[in-house]
A protein has these predicted regions:
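Short alpha-helical elements
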Residues: 1-259
Length: 259
């Protein structure tokens, strides 16, 4: 638990580098007489990543566990530049977890790495997420969603449009998938204003994860290390939301949660 506490505190304070964290802790030897080394900290942080996610889920459920409306989106996580992609050694021992080349339609850029899929409630609390290869289509994550969620509505962007997947979600789990129409669709309709406002919530989450938690910055040299960093950042994000709830503050104002 001490490792998790130290990890969550450093992420919440915006300390993104483990080496930098331990350079700071050297000045507090009296407060941390039994402080482990940076290498031991990294190893134990990887070992406790599943426990960290379990605690995060309980906090998320305690904030708005009865949510019936969700937003879904994805975020590119680049591990190196495209030119160095073929020389990247991350995941070389396990191809199923190795990064791949992908394309981000919103940014109109090619990249090499992973894709972070996120499902959050209308209040901004992240309930589910996963990290896949960059080449995996957004729709594939919905196959995992239907195994966990049911009797709810999910708002997605145009990347989730598909009559077959919408019908499958509705018939298998009574999930209603709402997506804006493409301009060239025959049955085109203007986007509903409440739907557009709901979509802004997950975009705000991504902005906060990139700004305060620097989720797109990668120092990891292996796949497990990257996954552990992602889990730690999203867990710290949820903890700050939980702190705001306990203090009767808007849960989205995470920058002021530690004040």
């Amino acid at each position: 638990m001490e490792v998790l506490s130290l990890s969550m505190t450093s992420e919440s304070l915006g300390i993104d580098s483990e080496a930098y964290l331990f350079s700071i802790l050297k000045g507090y030897k009296k407060e941390f007489p039994n402080l482990i080394s940076c290498r031991q900290y990294n190893d134990r942080r990887k070992f406790t990543r599943n426990l960290c996610e379990t605690i995060r889920k309980r906090m998320a459920d305690s904030i708005d566990g009865g949510e019936d409306y969700f937003c879904i989106d994805s975020k590119p996580i680049e591990v190196c530049r495209v030119a160095r992609g073929k020389r990247c050694t991350m995941g070389k021992n396990d191809y199923s977890k190795a990064p791949s080349f992908g394309y981000c339609a919103s940014q109109k850029t090619h990249y090499y790495g992973y894709k972070l899929h996120v499902l959050c409630g209308l209040s901004g609390v992240i309930h589910s997420y996963d990290l896949t290869k960059a080449s995996v289509h957004d729709i594939n994550y919905l196959q995992d969603i239907k195994l966990t969620y049911h009797d709810c509505s999910i708002f997605g962007d145009r990347g989730y449009i598909g009559k077959e997947i919408q019908l499958d979600l509705f018939e298998s789990a009574n999930i209603k998938l709402e997506c804006p129409y493409r301009l060239n669709q025959k049955d085109w309709k203007p986007q509903c204003l409440p739907f557009a406002r709901a979509r802004k919530r997950i975009e705000t989450d991504f902005s906060q994860l990139c700004d305060q938690f620097m989720i797109i910055r990668n120092y990891a040299k292996d796949t497990i290390g990257l996954f552990t960093r992602i889990i730690g950042k999203i867990s710290a994000f949820t903890i700050l939301q939980y702190v705001n709830k306990l203090n009767n503050r808007p849960i989205g104002e995470i920058k002021y949660a530690m004040n």
